[in-house]
Amino acid sequence: MNLEILAQLTALAFIVVSGPLVIALLAFRKGNL
C-alpha cells in the first residue's frame, strides 16, 4: 500500500473521529456550566 494514501486515510479518519468528539466535548462542558 502506498504510504501517501495511508497517510491521507489516517488524516481523514482522524478528522472524522475528532469532529463529533469535539462537538460532544463542547456540549458536555456547556451542560456542566
From Swiss-Prot:
Keyword Kinase set for record: no
Key words of the record: Chloroplast, Membrane, Photosynthesis, Photosystem II, Plastid, Thylakoid, Transmembrane, Transmembrane helix
Listed GO biological process terms: photosynthesis
Residue intervals passing through the bilayer: 5-25
Location of the protein in the cell: Plastid, Chloroplast thylakoid membrane
Keyword Signal attributed: no
A GO CC term assigned to this protein in UniProt: photosystem II
Domain of life of the organism encoding this protein: Eukaryota
Main location: plastid
Pfam families for this protein: PSII_Ycf12 (PF05969)
Membrane protein topology class: Single-pass membrane protein
Function (record text): A core subunit of photosystem II (PSII), probably helps stabilize the reaction center.
Subunit composition and interactions: PSII is composed of 1 copy each of membrane proteins PsbA, PsbB, PsbC, PsbD, PsbE, PsbF, PsbH, PsbI, PsbJ, PsbK, PsbL, PsbM, PsbT, PsbX, PsbY, PsbZ, Psb30/Ycf12, peripheral proteins of the oxygen-evolving complex and a large number of cofactors. It forms dimeric complexes.
Family: Belongs to the Psb30/Ycf12 family.
Protein name: Photosystem II reaction center protein Psb30
Lineage summary: Eukaryota, Viridiplantae, Streptophyta, Coleochaetophyceae, Coleochaetales
Gene name per UniProt: psb30
